[in-house]
Design a protein with these regions (language model features):
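Substrate-binding pocket helix/loop in short-chain dehydrogenase/reductase
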Residues: 74-75, 82-87
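C-terminal helical subdomain
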Residues: 151-164, 174-198
Length: 198
């Protein structure tokens, strides 16, 4: 939904996903959309991919960090390696991406960094020990980026989604839920676009 929204609004969109297959459908459906296979948890791969994006599409005006890693379970159950991977995807990737995009945004005195998250960024819950800390760190990192880059023209915002997103697997998980129980991906995309341009 995010890719479709920004493409419809006239942006050339670079999409990043671990697997190429997830990107191909959107590339064939939309114009001015280019997919790049990359594991955002790998900083070397991410920097190389960002170089490709800049050479093919130019310097980004808006970054939406929507990747998510999760290791669910109690603090006694979670695998520390999977927890570290979730931290790399959720928090470290944001750090690396911000370092890559903000220099040109600051030079232009225009740009936006939007990060999607959820209420796990604000509170811990049972069985979220491998996820909530990574989202809290992500939110606090973005707040720090906002304080530092904001006065230089870069708008940074954390979009906390306190709802169940309407996806095939969530429909399956909540079979008896009514339509208005779910948050529509298009509504999230519209809000992210609005925030990026406020």
């Amino acid at each position: 939904a995010l890719v479709r929204k920004f493409a419809r609004e006239g942006y050339r969109v670079a999409m990043i996903s671990r697997t190429r297959e997830r990107l191909e459908a959107l590339e064939s459906e939309l114009t001015d959309v280019k997919g790049f296979a990359c594991d955002v948890a790998d900083s070397v791969e991410l920097e190389s991919t960002f170089g490709e994006i800049e050479s093919q599409l130019g310097q980004p005006q808006v970054l939406v960090h929507n990747a998510v890693g999760a290791e669910r379970g109690t603090y006694m159950e979670i695998d520390p390696e999977k927890f570290l991977k979730a931290f790399q995807v959720n928090t470290m990737a944001l750090l690396h991406l911000a370092r890559l995009v903000t220099p040109s945004m600051i030079e232009r005195q225009f740009g936006a960094i939007i990060c999607t998250g959820n209420t796990s960024a604000y509170r811990g819950k049972p069985r979220f020990a491998g996820f909530a800390p990574t989202k809290a760190a992500q939110r606090i990192l973005l707040e720090s980026i906002a304080r530092e880059a904001g006065p230089k023209g870069v708008h940074a915002a954390y979009v906390a989604i306190d709802a169940v997103i309407d996806l095939p697997w969530t429909r399956e998980a909540f079979k008896d839920a009514k339509d208005d129980f779910f948050c529509k991906p298009d509504d999230i995309a519209d809000e992210c676009f609005r925030i990026a341009h406020q």
